[in-house]
Structures are given as structure tokens and as C-alpha cells.
């Protein structure tokens, strides 16, 4: 029996959250085509042949001077020292420059490269990309092609990860899907629905705080505040006669209900907090709040 923690590292939009959901065969991680969508570390628990692997989905590595983005990158880098294995995820279409930047961080634990999205390319392109990474072979333990859409890739990746885990009793109940709180996952589902329903820039000025939950056998009640930085953004989030907010709520309620396996009553409010992305104390509390 082995058990351990695996940090998923990579650039924004490399497909890290989609990979987690595919390994778990359940949606718990926020997925968006927009960059820097992941803000909090999600811990997904995957059981593989009596071994327990806890995957930590981290914010994407990127360069930015914004306070929020700096804290996100710091969170990702910190997770590299708090794990047993690093899974470096890169799209098969990305250059090796991101991997070189990752190596410059001097990772101290074994790492595996996962070339994602291989279902979108041909064998010749994949072989060419594998040869480009070959010059770094002294650094990584393995390089594994992967597709989140095809289950046939799953076993090979999990087998490779288990090789580098220590013998250890389970850290969590093997029936659990995640070590993250349900509230944290629901919050990300709401944020994901904002991303899906609004233009490219507005979602980045928004955050979600769930301030009330009531869970009964047949009904889950949630009340959440969507925080944004200007009155004009508040108006866009609400929409004409509340249409946009209703659409966000409908989408989020569907995702939450599917995971919770019960009816969901979701009440959304929109609050303006100017310059919240520059308030370091607020951001630290926000990013570390799992209650």
C-alpha cells in the first residue's frame, strides 16, 4: 500500500484541471478556456490498485505584476515543496520553454512530464515533441503522453506515479473524492459559471464568497456573494432585469446538484469591493479560506 501527494504544475491553460477531473472521473476542479482560472488548490483523491494518490491542482505558472497573480504563483511554487511527486503538465502544442522555466525553480522532488491533448494531434507531431524533451532526460523520471478524453491513457500515468510514492497508510478515507471542502468546490463551480457567461476581462475582476450553507437530506441551500470591483461590473454581472445573474445561477446550480446528488437552492448576490485584487490581506484570507 502506497500513499502520497502529487502537485500538478504547468502554465495556465495547459489542461491541469481537466486532467484532474479525468483521473477522478468526476468533475470537482474548475475548468475554463480563460487563463489563470484556478485560484485555490484543489485536492483530488484517486485510488489506484489499493494505492492512494492525492493530486493537488495548483494555479498556473505565469508572469504578472498584479498582487493576486503574484500570490497565485507563490501558491503554486510552494506546493512543489509540499509533495512527493510533481506532475509537470504541458500541452503537446507548447514549446519546451515552459519546462525550462520550471527547471529554473530547482524542483527538489521527482517529477514526471505529462504531454497533454495528444488526441488533438498526429503521431509524427507527438514524436517530434518527445524528441524535443529528450535533451532534458537527466531531469525528469518519465514523460507520458496523455489525453483527458481517452481513458486508455489513465492507467499508464497512474502506474508511473505510484513508483515514486512511499509505503504509507491512507491519508484520507478511500471513499472520499476530494480533501477540499465541498464549500470550496461549490464556490469554484460558481466562479466557473461566471467565466462561461461573461466576456474575457470581467471574470478576472470577480470572486465568490459563500456565506451560508444548509444541507438537508433532500435539499442543499447556498447563499453566495459575487465580489467585483466597480458598479459598472456589478451591472454587467446582474444583466438586464437580472438575466445574466439568473443564467450564472442556473449553470452553477446544475453543476453543484450533479456533485451533491440532490436539489440545490442557490441565492446569488453581487457586492462591490473596490481594488479587492490589490488588498493583500483580503486575498490571502480568500485564497486560504476552506471553511
From Swiss-Prot:
Residues binding GTP, per UniProt: 10-17, 57-61, 116-119
Keyword Oxidoreductase: no
Region (G5): 146-148
GO cellular component: cytosol; plasma membrane
Region (G1): 10-17
KH type-2 domain mapped to chain residues: 186-274
Protein name (database record): GTPase Era
Species of origin: Campylobacter jejuni subsp. jejuni serotype O:2 (strain ATCC 700819 / NCTC 11168)
Biological classification of the source: Bacteria, Pseudomonadati, Campylobacterota, Epsilonproteobacteria, Campylobacterales
